[in-house]
Amino acid sequence: MARKKIREYDSKRLLKEHLKRLAGIDLQILSAQVTQSTDFTELVNQQPWLSTMKLVVKPDMLFGKRGKSGLVALNLDIAQVKEFVKERLGVEVEMGGCKAPITTFIVEPFVPHDQEYYLSIVSERLGSTISFSECGGIEIEENWDKVKTIFLPTEKPMTPDACAPLIATLPLEARGKIGDFIKGVFAVFQDLDFSFLEMNPFTIVNGEPYPLDMRGELDDTAAFKNFKKWGNIEFPLPFGRVLSSTEGFIHDLDEKTSASLKFTVLNPKGRIWTMVAGGGASVIYADTVGDLGYASELGNYAEYSGAPNEEEVLQYARVVLDCATADPDGRKRALLIGGGIANFTDVGATFSGIIRALREKESKLKAARMHIYVRRGGPNYQTGLAKMRKLGAELGVPIEVYGPEATMTGICKQAIECVMAAA
């Protein structure tokens, strides 16, 4: 499962659309998204309620505590909303130690209310955890002792009996409506492959549940079966994260393939770089370098998996090598081409793409005094390793090659010793 956060606008859009389909509950929520490209005149023409109702506006940027941070404006008309957005759009704010400009807002009707409820659903390994409280809102953390929680195993349906402990202390007249709402939201959660969903708070308007603030995460590995249900969904980067041009290139490449291609620059001046096969292995290599005390020298995080073809690996490796060899300073550098023992990825084929990239970047590798350490196993690995050994001799670039007889992370220590040596 790959949990990906989505904007509040999309969370509410999905809930409104599919709660009616799955549970017959017609949420009366309205919302509009505002970005740099928004024309307010056109927006109001498309959504006339914006000019007839009092409004709420807030950033929709995947960070919480917006109310406590003074980033939520209440009871405005559309002209005031426009001014609020104008003053803050593109302005950098700091949240949770991360700084980034605000680029996206959500605008909704202002809903006066007295009661605030809390609801969250979290996907766990063996089922789902559902939490509910009658004391929702910005003080939910201070009132966490009042939150009721149940665990629903994967094979169990959300029945009235299962839901009963959550709503047991509600007034009798409210239990049916809120219980049906919780069951309906859970149906949407499962049907659309949400991995996390939170409403803090939701309230009751004209006798019906009404989400005021909402967060959602989807399991993006389920996109293949949900693309029609999700519609034009966006998976924004985490707040404060901006892709470099090289990272953006790999991100676009990853979007176009059934394989997985990931690349993040951690320290452009780092002297230890990785190009690792497998999601688990890639983390192990990075952690090992850190555990040995050299996290500050780690240049990147990189992972390829899911049997990418030779051309995809070639494009991927070019980017990694360009970053790893940039701005040579006379000191040694190391590249870890590692991985575990593949089950189905043709090691010979993926290494062919890497070898082509290494040939192209020969002069850069030498200028950067790059030492390469290879460890891999799996289908056709002997062919791949033999090609790597031959390449080292041809290029005159130091390449040490190991198969599954060597420990997976042994090359990390060798790389560190190499770059830290005086010569």
UniProtKB/Swiss-Prot annotation:
It catalyses: oxaloacetate + acetyl-CoA + ADP + phosphate = citrate + ATP + CoA. Its EC number is 2.3.3.8. Gene3D superfamilies: 3.30.470.110, Succinyl-CoA synthetase domains. It is found in: Cytoplasm, Cytosol. InterPro entries: Citrate-bd (IPR032263), Citrate_synth_N (IPR056749), Succinyl-CoA_synth-like (IPR016102). The keyword Acyltransferase applies. The keyword Transferase applies. PANTHER family: SUCCINATE--COA LIGASE [GDP-FORMING] SUBUNIT BETA, MITOCHONDRIAL, SUCCINYL-COA SYNTHETASE BETA CHAIN. Belongs to the succinate/malate CoA ligase beta subunit family. ATP citrate-lyase is the primary enzyme responsible for the synthesis of cytosolic acetyl-CoA, used for the elongation of fatty acids and biosynthesis of isoprenoids, flavonoids and malonated derivatives. May supply substrate to the cytosolic acetyl-CoA carboxylase, which generates the malonyl-CoA used for the synthesis of a multitude of compounds, including very long chain fatty acids and flavonoids. In contrast to all known animal ACL enzymes having a homomeric structure, plant ACLs are composed of alpha and beta chains. This is ATP-citrate synthase alpha chain protein 2. It comes from Oryza sativa subsp. japonica.
